[in-house]
């Protein structure tokens, strides 16, 4: 007698399950198992089977979804965002186009200090509504799991406010969120002459954040003019002692040694890495620290030097991709666009890109055993794409290829409708 399950997806043109026993590094990122003419079975929010046509034999479903030859993949994972913030900074773009430097904009109260001011002034409810709007956009582009950082408070109450908003978001809408405490995002004006005291203030928040389960990771911006390698080492060691996973904004501009520090501390991820040295790349590979690359930021800032993804992959580094969604240097929720930029400017292949936005991204935020793969027992988080094959998504840029998004086996995005009028 056939076993009854909730849903079966049939007539899948190509299926990427992204099955892996761990994050993919180096040459293994090129190994992509593509299943043609595939099926997926779902019951009680979990994957029952995902494979070649015929795997559905012995099952009957309450609902049959005909994918009509479309591509199906796991839901995408965005492992680096600054989702919770007040205000916006579109005026700065015009100022930059007029030749005004970022330092001059900062001196006028703009830049990150503008976002800090707006985030401090916003109520928790205002931040919640704004972040929810942006998160719905992320979901519409196929992101079903994401990381979110604090870091626009730079003082106790606002940092905690940002983290509370992220926790409420996680509990109230479909996208799974992993929170990172990034009080060490910048040095506020009141601490410009004493950054060590500021770091002590941020470290003092760790027990409360841990007790209230507001964040899983701690992050710091290691860069010229922000925090030194020595300061970052002390901060991250204290965070590790408090039970937090470690992340680091490393070498975005200068090869300061952030990647080497990430490797030495065995951080879960090191992010940005535009200026990382050969030695830094080697240390990341040796430590198994995941490189989260943010090419959308380089693109938006109009810079020509991108992170050296090819050198990292050749050295055996595990590479991931993220939007870095934030109001100043990467105002986009569209991870599909990031996939295209990675192909064009990081010279990553389509196979490498798919690993970078699914399984590797999931491991970069501690969700490797839950997200980024379609296999029996995993949550049924998947995307049905209006695309004939996996290479089409990074190839055809600037549009949304999502047809439907499923989260825990339920359709949460449906773009089937025709344009009216």
UniProtKB/Swiss-Prot annotation:
InterPro entries: Amidohydro-rel, HutI, Metal-dep_hydrolase_composite, Metal_Hydrolase. GO terms for cellular component: cytoplasm. Transmembrane segments: none annotated. Zn(2+) binds at residues 80, 82, 249, 324. One of its GO terms (molecular function) is imidazolonepropionase activity. It catalyses: 4-imidazolone-5-propanoate + H2O = N-formimidoyl-L-glutamate. HAMAP family: HutI (MF_00372). NCBIfam families: hutI (TIGR01224). This is Imidazolonepropionase. The lineage of its organism: Bacteria, Bacillati, Bacillota, Bacilli, Bacillales.
